[in-house]
Each structure stands twice: as structure tokens, then as C-alpha cells.
């Protein structure tokens, strides 16, 4: 009898579990994966090239659109690289605000990951709960920047503006009656810090709810335990970072190992896995949400007691105040020049990396002394993770490929750039 050849299957890019535009060419022996070949580039938008034609400030909104689930963390690495080259000091209050919003972004990302991952595996309920909490955090974004997703809130030298004293209120509509609106607005009567503090008090209970639904769930464990195992040595060799590396038992977190902003003043722990499988990575990310909540609490407490500027006083970089612009012609000219021509950055190069929710997100900038970068290179955390997909999926079933894609927490905006 003739030998049966392996079967080739196209997975995605229209597949609901492909998380955007992933195309996988799977080589199968029956239902067992022999090879997984990811095809990328379907969401390529030439961000690195576009940044060469725009001033440093005009490229900030492009950063939001890279990993469009962790918006402010992308901006953070970019503005840190600019600040390194300009050698400017960021006010302490702005550093605390950045750290607080980095952690809000981390929770936003992990909630999206948890909901989507559980949905891919077949658990519908967690998805709905996770999005309930995401709404509150999106409102924090909206309060400081006016946008629920693409905030462009971090600026070279600080942040766009200080935290507001009021929260946006829900208005009565056709789909919600007055009673529902008053319930929604109940915790929005104070400042943004009051709202965030209220959220941090409620959030640990929500995380317990997710764990009740999943952690000891027999089906969840059958789908995740022992799937996509990566040894610590292989994880480091393949360039894994973030939860993908910590899930394999390597204690590496830039917030502790190479502290930036005020992370060295924060009290938090790094969760680390032992087996390097999908289940350990799930546990690591769930614990990360609890640790992020701890950091946010510390930031809220400090910000309540310490006022101060949120933008550097270096006026080559910082725009004039809105009040000054309305009364002073020089301020108006300064504002116009800053946002049209931009500031010139000294010749040199800088690399800045942050502990992004998905791993190490780095921005490498080269300046030739002009008002726009000569070259920008983005180090996307998801890129090496996707590269390791072939090794992680080998020998598993087709259904497990969905679990492995889910555990990698892949977003194509940053991979294709």
C-alpha cells in the first residue's frame, strides 16, 4: 500500500481564533501537527518608515496603533527613547502617573487576553466578565485624554495634562433608564483618583471570580496542562520575554532588573511558573493582574499627597500653557512652531525598553540632528513568541494550536508593524 503523505491545512487568516490576521500553514499527520509555519505581513503598515517622515511628536499616535490592546505602554518606550537622547528629566509626578497608567494598561491587556483565550478554548462566561472590567479602565483613559483607546497621553518630557478632578458621566439614553444611569454614575462623583481607587478595591474580588471559573476547572486544565511546554533554556534561546519567559521559570522583569521611572520605589512581586506550559502562563498572568493592582494602589496614594508639575520645564520640548497662549503672542508662536516644525534632537542613538504586558517592548532611535528620526526600530515582544510557535505546537493536536496561539497573547499590530 502506498505511503500516506502529510496533509496541509491553512489555519486563518479569517479564523476567529487567529487573533487578527495570523495565517498558519499546518502540516498534519492525521490530526497531529508536524510543522506550523506562520505567515506574517498581512497587517503591515510601515510604522517604522512613516516615523522617518514625521516629527518626533507626530509619531506618538502611531505607537498607540502598534499593539492596539496595550496602547500607553507602546508610547512609554518611544517617549523614553526621545528623553534619553534629549537628556531631559521627567517630573516625579509625571513618572508616577506613567507607572499608574502602565499598570492600568497591563490589566486592560490581560483582561482582553483572558477573555479571548477562554473563549477560544470554549469558556464563554469569562469573556463577558472581563469586558465588564475593561469598561471602567477605558473610562480612565477617556478621562485623561478624551479617547478610550488611542490616547497619545505620554509626551516627551512628561504627560499631556494632569489628572482631572471630575469623571465623565453616563447620560440617559434609549437603551438605559434613569435608574441604570444613576447606578453607573454612582462611583463617578469624585475625581479620577477616587474612581481608580474604587476600582482597585473591587478588582481583587473580580480576579477571584475568574479563578473560580477557570483555575480548578477540569476541562480548562485538560486543555492547558502540559500543552506548549517550553524549557527555560529554550525560552531564553528563542528570545522570549514577559509572561512567556516567566511561565518557564525565569525570573526576568525589566521593572525589577532594569527599573525605569519609579518602579524601584514600588513594592510588588514577580510571579514565576515552574512547568513552562500554557497553564503556568495563565497563572502567571492572573497573578500579574493582582500585582498591577498593588502598584496602582501605591501610585494613587502618592499622587493624592504630592502635587507638582507633570511636564518638564524645558521649553524646547514642552508646549506653553493654555492660559499663556490666550494672552501672550510669543507663547502662541512657540506653540505653533513646536507642533508644526517640532524640536531638534541631538545627533546620537538610544534604545529604551519597557516591561510591556506581552514582554520587552523596545524602541531604538537614531537621530542625525534633525526634527525627525533618521531611523526607528521597534522590538516587538510578540515577534519571537510567534517564531517559537512551530516548536511549541509540534506533536500536539489541531485543537491545541488554538490554545498555544492564545497563550502567546499575540496581537498583529506590533508583529507586522
From Swiss-Prot:
Quote the cellular component terms of the Gene Ontology held in the record.
plasma membrane
GO MF terms on file? NAD binding; NADH:ubiquinone reductase (non-electrogenic) activity; quinone binding
Q: What is the main EC category here? A: translocase
Chief place where the protein resides: membrane
Q: Please indicate if the UniProt record lists Cell inner membrane as a keyword.
A: yes
User: What membrane topology is given?
Assistant: Peripheral membrane protein
Q: Which PROSITE patterns match?
A: COMPLEX1_49K
Q: Which family does it belong to?
A: Belongs to the complex I 49 kDa subunit family.
Protein name as it appears in the record:
NADH-quinone oxidoreductase subunit D
| Gene of this entry | nuoD
Amino acid at each position: 500500500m502506498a505511503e500516506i503523505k502529510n496533509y496541509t491545512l491553512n489555519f486563518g487568516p479569517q479564523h476567529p481564533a487567529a487573533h487578527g490576521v495570523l495565517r498558519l500553514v499546518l502540516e498534519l499527520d492525521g490530526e497531529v501537527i508536524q510543522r506550523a509555519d506562520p505567515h506574517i505581513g498581512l497587517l503591515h503598515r510601515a510604522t517604522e518608515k512613516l516615523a522617518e517622515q514625521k516629527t518626533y511628536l507626530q509619531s506618538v499616535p502611531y505607537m498607540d496603533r502598534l499593539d492596539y490592546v496595550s496602547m500607553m505602554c507602546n508610547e512609554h518606550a518611544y517617549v523614553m527613547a526621545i528623553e534619553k537622547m534629549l537628556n531631559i528629566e521627567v517630573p516625579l509626578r509625571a513618572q508616577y502617573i506613567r507607572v499608574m497608567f502602565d499598570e492600568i494598561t497591563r490589566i486592560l491587556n490581560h483582561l482582553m487576553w483572558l477573555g479571548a483565550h477562554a473563549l477560544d478554548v470554549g469558556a464563554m462566561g469569562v469573556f463577558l466578565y472581563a469586558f465588564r472590567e475593561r469598561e471602567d479602565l477605558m473610562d480612565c483613559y477617556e478621562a485623561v485624554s478624551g479617547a478610550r483607546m488611542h490616547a497619545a497621553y505620554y509626551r516627551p518630557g512628561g504627560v499631556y495634562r494632569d489628572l482631572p478632578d471630575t469623571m465623565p458621566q453616563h447620560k440617559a439614553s434609549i437603551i438605559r433608564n434613569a435608574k441604570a444611569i444613576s447606578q453607573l454614575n454612582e462611583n463617578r462623583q469624585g475625581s479620577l483618583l477616587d474612581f481608580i481607587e474604587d476600582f482597585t478595591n473591587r478588582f481583587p474580588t473580580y480576579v477571584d471570580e475568574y479563578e473560580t471559573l477557570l483555575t480548578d476547572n477540569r476541562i480548562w486544565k485538560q486543555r492547558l496542562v502540559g500543552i506548549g511546554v517550553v524549557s527555560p533554556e529554550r525560552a531564553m534561546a528563542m528570545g522570549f520575554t514577559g509572561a512567556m519567559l516567566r511561565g518557564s521559570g525565569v525570573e526576568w522583569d525589566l521593572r525589577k532588573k532594569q527599573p525605569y521611572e519609579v518602579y524601584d520605589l514600588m513594592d510588588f512581586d514577580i510571579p514565576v511558573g515552574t512547568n513552562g506550559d500554557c497553564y503556568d502562563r495563565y497563572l502567571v498572568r492572573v497573578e500579574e493582574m493582582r500585582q498591577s493592582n498593588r502598584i496602582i494602589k501605591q501610585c494613587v496614594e502618592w499622587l493624592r499627597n504630592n502635587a507638582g508639575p507633570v511636564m518638564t520645564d524645558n521649553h524646547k520640548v514642552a508646549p506653553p500653557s493654555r492660559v499663556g497662549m490666550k494672552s501672550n503672542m510669543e507663547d502662541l508662536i512657540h506653540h505653533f512652531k513646536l507642533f508644526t516644525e517640532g524640536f531638534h534632537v541631538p545627533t546620537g542613538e538610544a534604545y529604551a525598553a519597557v516591561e510591556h504586558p506581552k514582554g520587552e517592548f523596545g524602541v531604538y532611535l537614531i537621530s542625525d540632528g534633525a526634527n525627525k528620526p533618521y531611523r526607528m526600530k521597534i522590538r516587538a515582544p510578540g515577534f519571537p513568541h510567534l517564531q517559537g510557535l512551530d516548536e511549541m505546537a509540534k506533536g500536539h493536536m489541531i485543537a491545541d494550536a488554538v490554545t498555544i496561539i492564545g497563550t502567546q497573547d499575540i496581537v498583529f499590530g506590533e508583529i507586522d508593524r
